[in-house]
Amino acid sequence: MAYISGKTMLENAYKEGYGVGAFSAHNAETIQGILEAAEQMKSPIMIQVGQKVIQNVGLEPMKALIDIYMKDVTVPVAVHLDHCRDLGQAMKAIQLGFQSVMFDGSALSFEENAEKTKLVADAASHLGIGSEGEIGKIGGTEDDITVDEKDAQITSEEEALAFADRSRVDYLALSIGTAHGIYKQEPELAFDRIEEISKSLNKPLVMHGGSDVPDADVKKAIGLGIAKINVDTELRVAFTEGMKQCLQDNPNEYHLAHSLGAGKEAMIDKVKEKIRVFGSENKARTY
């Protein structure tokens, strides 16, 4: 299976009532882990490339690395640019062959957010690439941007509809009670708001801050219209704990292939766990 447009992938998930995991990659081992888990579970997935990784590795090198490991992959995969705040970077990702791009203008005024997001959505649409925008303020820390939880704002139905109409994005990220990073307390999701917006908008919705949200809450949100669930923190924790355990068991282990391999295996287990929760296992055959 070749790469597939994020738009096609999420519209299929939305129609069929399951969620697609958008898993953040950071290096070769995390790319391998995400793809191996998807293959084992026969699941469509998104690989996300975030801003911190772009700062450390570079946009083009990350896409090239993913391309290398995609050669023998048989499940549908979309590479997604996450939380882009620079129009030039978004256009570069489109040129590099990303299948999905997000412009995050949530820190801007409504008008500027909609205007800039539409520029990205229009460019992506011409090439059949999926586009994502964000309306509302999602709490927590994502790369170099922090939104205090007290400043987080639940997205209203009115602003979601107006933003979707103005920006023309294919799928929309909402502020629904989740947060980026590690939760200080269990999140309270605005299920009624998800349902209202989904019924009015009739297009895939996106959950950011999907790590550590209770499984039952995630499943309920998917049933109400969430089609893309972003997962990063839980994967990084699993990978790091896998490495730590390897080094604790073997204090004199200096072969990075061993410790990184242990991290990858732990991450594979976590990705497979999430795929089961999202309901995308064996959904690759529907493409």
From Swiss-Prot:
Cofactor binding annotation: Binds 1 zinc ion per subunit.
Entry-linked Pfam families: F_bP_aldolase
Annotated InterPro entries: Aldolase_TIM, Class_II_FBP_aldolase, FBA_II
Gene Ontology biological-process entries: carbohydrate metabolic process
Active-site feature positions: 82 (proton donor)
Catalytic activity: 6-deoxy-6-sulfo-D-fructose 1-phosphate = (2S)-3-sulfolactaldehyde + dihydroxyacetone phosphate
Annotated Zn(2+) binding sites: 83, 180, 208
Record-linked SUPFAM superfamilies: Aldolase
Keywords, ordered alphabetically: Carbohydrate metabolism, Lyase, Metal-binding, Zinc
Positions that bind dihydroxyacetone phosphate: 181, 209-211, 230-233
Residues spanning the membrane: none
Cofactor(s) the record lists: Zn(2+)
Top-level taxon: Bacteria
EC annotation from Swiss-Prot or TrEMBL: 4.1.2.57
GO molecular function: aldehyde-lyase activity; zinc ion binding
Enzyme class: lyase
PANTHER family: D-TAGATOSE-1,6-BISPHOSPHATE ALDOLASE (PTHR30304), D-TAGATOSE-1,6-BISPHOSPHATE ALDOLASE SUBUNIT GATY-RELATED (PTHR30304:SF0)
Function: Part of the sulfo-EMP2 pathway, a D-sulfoquinovose degradation pathway that produces sulfolactate (SL). Cleaves 6-deoxy-6-sulfo-D-fructose 1-phosphate (SFP) to form dihydroxyacetone phosphate (DHAP) and 3-sulfolactaldehyde (SLA).
Family that this chain belongs to: Belongs to the class II fructose-bisphosphate aldolase family.
Name of this chain's protein: Sulfofructosephosphate aldolase
Species this protein is from: Alkalicoccus urumqiensis
Record gene name: sqiA
